[in-house]
């Protein structure tokens, strides 16, 4: 899978010898080999790092079969922003490179330069629709209008086979997470490569005209991006925990049978995706947000069956509860919610079949976030979901 941008794959290449990755003078050889998938896969297998190529998931799957130790990273981008970027890319191709383009790409470049943006989108819908879903679903860009539901199902299933999922909009944090996980030196630069000249950029008016059609063309990509966001947030939360553990002498302790670990938002927080602590008429709490996913790491090593009780002081919108998901150790678990005085109490039972050796990971996810300004016109624009007061974990027994 293309790793999402020149800056990012240059960062990856900095961690390998020059001949361990694809050299710029090797592209003609690789393009010839593409006609023979087996020979192409074998040639790529000789490399330590594969970047620059636009590969769909079928190529990735072949590499994974040849080398189970292969690690795959991809960056997803907000679909409409990606389309804006691609149109600007085609507009900026230098004249000196025109002779090297095939007929399809030459037409794209000439049309991007000469046609109104909305006419260009209308003509080249196939190239601008659900590209990331096609890549992850193993479907060529040349396939016109693949059925959306099977495409999205395949893309999301294959996304689970990607080791590291990052976001173009969070490229520096993605690089930090990957450096920590892979033992790389983080050489990610703030320098922007392949910058589009102002006269080749889409104007604000052009973007407004084509935003709606592009959103409609990329409904699968929008859903795929949302799934990718959750993978990225999980990776970022674990990276922050790793940084904390490396710098701290604190070690989680076993949770004996029948004992209860009680965590209050009065205590120091180890987690990600939470607003600052707030004091209220009842007790301190933290709002989950601003993203749709919030993670809390608890300092215990439970095993077997657990009972979890979460005290929720407030919910920004009733719509949050209809989509709220709870995961324990990255496994979705069912839960019940009941009213207790001024609070909502969420209760769940989770089974951890393997003895845990580290922190207990609790994740709260929702379909959307809201602000007090959105809901009631209050001058508070922070995106929030639920306000958590306490979390209790009881060790019930071993599996």
Would you name each region that the model predicts?
Residues 1-32, 294-295:
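N-terminal pre-catalytic "stem/leader" segment of glycosyltransferase-like enzymes
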Residues 34, 52-58, 187-250:
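PAPS-dependent sulfotransferase catalytic core
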Residues 246-303, 316-317, 367-399:
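Glycan-recognition and processing domains
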Residues 48-49, 352-364:
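Noncatalytic modules at the cell exterior or secretory-pathway interfaces
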Residues 319-332:
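Short, surface-exposed beta-strand/strand-loop-strand elements in extracellular ectodomains
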Residues 22, 28-75, 81-190:
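PAPS-dependent sulfotransferase catalytic domain
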Residues 4, 78, 166, 178, ...:
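Generic structural signal for small/hydrophobic residues in well-ordered secondary structure
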Residues 28-29, 333-356:
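Extracellular carbohydrate recognition and processing domains
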């Amino acid at each position: 899978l293309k790793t999402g941008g020149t800056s990012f794959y240059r960062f990856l290449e900095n961690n390998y010898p020059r001949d361990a990755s694809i050299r710029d003078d090797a592209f003609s050889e690789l393009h010839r080999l593409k006609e023979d998938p087996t020979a192409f896969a074998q040639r790529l297998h000789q490399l330590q790092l594969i970047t620059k190529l636009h590969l769909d998931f079928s190529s990735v799957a072949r590499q994974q079969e040849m080398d189970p130790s292969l690690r795959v990273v991809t960056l997803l981008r907000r679909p409409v922003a990606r389309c804006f970027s691609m149109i600007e890319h085609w507009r900026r191709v230098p004249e000196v490179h025109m002779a090297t383009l095939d007929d399809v790409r030459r037409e794209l470049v000439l049309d991007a330069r000469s046609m109104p943006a909305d006419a260009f989108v209308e003509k080249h819908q196939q190239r601008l629709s659900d590209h990331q879903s096609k890549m992850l679903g193993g479907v060529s860009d040349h396939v016109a209008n693949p059925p959306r539901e099977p495409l999205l199902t395949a893309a999301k299933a294959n996304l689970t086979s990607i080791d590291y999922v990052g976001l173009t909009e969070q490229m520096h944090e993605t690089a930090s997470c990957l450096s920590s996980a892979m033992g790389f030196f983080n050489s990610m630069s703030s320098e922007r490569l392949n910058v589009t000249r102002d006269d080749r950029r889409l104007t604000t008016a052009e973007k407004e005209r084509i935003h709606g059609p592009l959103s409609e063309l990329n409904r699968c990509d929008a859903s795929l991006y949302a799934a990718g966001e959750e993978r990225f947030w999980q990776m970022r939360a674990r990276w922050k925990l790793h940084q904390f553990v490396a710098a701290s002498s604190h070690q989680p302790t076993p949770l004996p049978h029948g004992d209860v670990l009680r965590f209050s938002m009065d205590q120091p927080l180890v987690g990600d995706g939470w607003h600052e602590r707030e004091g209220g008429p009842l007790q301190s709490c933290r709002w989950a947000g601003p993203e749709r996913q919030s993670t809390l790491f608890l300092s215990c090593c439970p095993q077997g069956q657990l009972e979890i009780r979460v005290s929720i002081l407030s919910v920004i919108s009733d719509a949050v509860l209809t989509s709220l998901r709870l995961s324990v150790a990255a496994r979705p678990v069912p839960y019940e919610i009941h009213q207790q005085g001024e609070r909502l109490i969420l209760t769940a039972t989770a089974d951890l079949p393997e003895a845990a050796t580290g922190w207990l990971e609790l994740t709260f996810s929702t379909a959307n976030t809201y602000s007090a300004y959105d809901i009631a016109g209050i001058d508070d624009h922070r995106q929030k979901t639920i306000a958590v007061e306490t979390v209790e974990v009881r060790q019930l027994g071993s599996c």
